[in-house]
């Protein structure tokens, strides 16, 4: 199974570098989509330009997270990846959980798999199975 991590970002220059560095400890290949950021996001991405395992897709105007995800998934497929794990660039997702999601996908007996991770699925009032 050929995985990459997809990181859509919009004006998350303060957290993006840390998220990329943490992601690289658990996944070799990253696709970052810069969704028209106007802060220092492009500068942060530039510090990773030597890393050939990081692909950056940028466009000048913000088009929303959904657009960024679609474009990132398309780029991941073009690069030959079979699976993508998405991680938000603001720090609300933990890159260290990526191997857990990859393992679930590997253990599935399906040709197409969607694995959703959530820290809140066992919260009070939530059904045991969603």
Model-derived segments and their meaning:
Residues 2-4:
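Cell-envelope/extracellular polymer assembly enzymes that use nucleotide-activated donors
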Residues 9, 33-35, 59:
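Conserved sequence signature across two-component system core domains
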Residues 14-18, 39-48, 96:
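Acidic helix N-cap motif at the loop->helix transition within catalytic regions
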Residues 23, 72, 90:
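Residue-level signature of catalytic and energy-coupling elements of molecular machines
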């Amino acid at each position: 199974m050929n995985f990459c991590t997809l990181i859509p970002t919009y004006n998350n220059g303060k957290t993006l570098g840390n998220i990329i560095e943490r992601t690289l400890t658990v996944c070799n290949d990253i696709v970052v989509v810069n969704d028209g950021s106007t802060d220092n996001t492009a500068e942060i991405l530039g510090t990773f330009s030597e890393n050939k395992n990081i692909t950056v897709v940028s466009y000048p105007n913000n088009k929303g997270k959904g657009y960024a995800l679609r474009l990132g998934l398309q780029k991941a497929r073009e690069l030959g990846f079979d699976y993508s794990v998405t991680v938000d660039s603001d720090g609300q997702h933990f890159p260290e959980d990526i191997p857990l999601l990859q393992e679930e996908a590997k253990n599935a007996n399906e040709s197409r798999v969607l694995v959703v991770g959530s820290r809140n699925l066992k919260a009070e009032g939530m059904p045991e199975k969603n």
